[in-house]
């Protein structure tokens, strides 16, 4: 166990369960120390033979130390010199990079690269002897050179690294007065050991190992690739050239200007000069891929690069790219600003995708689609990520946020417009409604925690910058844009976007710049309204009384939380455009935060007495709505009689609001659970998907409750049974119906419906005998077939299928299947594979841990493995890794015992440096404490309702 004696003693003195806690911890520690810690049963994790797609990179422990590249002298060594302004986190505003000439030479098999950068710098207003710019890990190999624009050499007195702020500092012998200068630096770095900066990975092709090297620079990793002024408002132009071996090609942001054969081995590829770009958007790749090409309606070449043996899987991406690209050029009334657009699927990629200008990089699962191997959900994911990254070519690339505190200007906008982009290509996918279940409703949960943060938030370290790449910046950002568009009208919103883009073309902008554009086109007080949504965390719940009076208060999941904490300049009051509907009448009434007594909706006089006033029509507002208990009961009756009185969005919203309100103590669980009775008649994907998610919280809390969980399963199993039986375990060409089938069959299996589990096991055995499965049923069969009937033979068979699979989406499904086995020995074997990068790529480690944690047998094992191997994970990924930062909250979402809370607190005390995971740790602690209190407060209420349901005709 990874617990120090002194902290053990301190915690063992706290609670009333001290003997139980300490005894269990000691026992678990001994078991894990002998089992997991020593790598029990690792026979499945021997390095495999080379095959089509298995990585052969060495495990991290065998890689060279990137801070000490061999074979070259190192200049500008790190010094603890704090006698200068380079101790500040931000670069000075009087230094401006104008142009970079960047040359790189990667040696693919040696996994090293060398480079040289010449930077044209404009110094304004201030005289100084010092220049400093960003550099991390990569080493300077010659003394930097500095000269004036006229060519006069300026002697360098010294240079040194200042590691706390990731700077290299150059001190000149003489004063540098406001003028133009040139700075030249040579450097060397390693291509291995990381998925950020300039790195390489491998793949298999016809039994041979192949290399590809590419970049991933957002948010603060360009400084790992080359010395640069690595802040988003330090835009400059670039001329990039790459010397590479003859049998490789190089691509970058801009088209190739020319290639030069240097000798029998090396070729130099020179790219055209770029437009002004932020450093995080600079990109290049050295590869042996092929491409699928489409031409936009305006003649722009659009290419999708993939491994030669997978190039057929790039066809769908190419088709989507053309349609969505043309759509956004038309919508924004602005041409794409570069001569070409490339996309490339990287075999090992740390994030989902990266919007580099003119060269978008992707994880393979998010770009490549095979109709014979990929599910409908995979197809939608590919289309959505493509659309998201295309939006960035305008929002983010042409106009970039001035600083990372306005990250949402990039990510919130891309997350909003991606649904419009996909809808342009796939009109039958209900994408404009799916934003509810993909973004709005999920982030309502995240933003109802005290540990949330405002959309615009101060960040002052790389870790803090990384941490704001979260649901608040992406999904809440998208959701409030949806609300804004509905309020000021789609026409004004579109005109405002066009105005914003044109006024800040090739520049940086702040949130107020966007509000200004929207105000000018709409004539409405956009800033006054929207500041209450971006400059304070959280959101309101609107209480509607029987007189149609609406009042607001901050919504928090924890009933005991202080709604005034942390302090807010708006005192947690919001300016709200309230959209409502009754009968055929729909309108928007504005709720000003200063109206302390609330507002009253004037209802139509010609409606029947039993008509229903729907507040937050289409769930377009970023808030929840609570009605009087008798109104909720009336709503249940209406839904039972004819749920189609309300549209898809409203039905999904009712369910989500009801269960969130009950969890927060604002609605009785009996009323929320009564509403679910209508689901026996529901036949649409979006309401079912959200119902399953809303119900899952109770399921997670009760899963280990042997007395109560079977009752929960019987009730909800009876609700899902009709539609599961109707849809059957069959193939279907209809996209939405396929998503619905997957949702309800998965839920039926979780409720342990005998028919559903029997079908999963039957299909699993057929698959074991060599019969192919329908692509939309595979994940269900892999998971529940393995769970219900999997043994060691089946697990080994699936593991071999995983090793030989070529499509990344199929490999990911098989990983989930492997993690679903109800066998501790096999799960332990799977965990032992994590450190073998020949078997599990770096990008998939957190996926595997997450899948194992979803297994009732594996959730404790995954948590224990992470605690035992934390130092290994930190060394492999660094504390700045956003996926590592989110890992604890991902694994601990269902924790609901004092022991689990104690383990978490102890772990955080032992490893206090959270890096990019600081906010995630706070969320994990808050959620676990809330779960413990929830069981104390509501278990009996839910138990009573379930007991009564078994003696009634509810279902």
Curated annotation (Swiss-Prot):
The active site is at 389 (proton acceptor). Binds 1 zinc ion per subunit. Substrate specificity is modulated by calcium which enhances the enzymatic activity for cleavage of acidic residues while reducing its activity with neutral and basic residues. Hydrolytic activity is inhibited by the aminopeptidase inhibitor (Leu and acidic inhibitor) amastatin, but not by bestatin (aminopeptidase inhibitor Leu inhibitor), leupeptin, pepstatin A and PMSF. Its hydrolytic activity is also strongly reduced by zinc ions, with a complete inhibition at 0.5 mM, and moderately inhibited by cobalt and copper ions. Glycans are attached at residues 118, 192, 319, 335, 458, 547, 584, 592, 674, 759, 823, 836. Its EC number is 3.4.11.7. Keywords: Aminopeptidase, Calcium, Cell membrane, Disulfide bond, Glycoprotein, Hydrolase, Membrane, Metal-binding, Metalloprotease, Protease, Signal-anchor, Transmembrane, Transmembrane helix, Zinc. Residues 39-955 are extracellular. It is a single-pass type II membrane protein. PROSITE patterns: ZINC_PROTEASE. Residues 1-17 are cytoplasmic. One of its GO terms (cellular component) is extracellular space. The record marks 474 as: Transition state stabilizer. The keyword Cell membrane applies. Homodimer; disulfide-linked. Venom protein that cleaves N-terminal acidic residues from peptides with high potency in presence of calcium. It may have several roles in venom including alteration of blood pressure by cleaving circulating angiotensin-2, general degradation of host tissue, increase of permeability to other venom components, and/or processing of other toxins in the venom. This is Glutamyl aminopeptidase. It comes from Bitis rhinoceros.
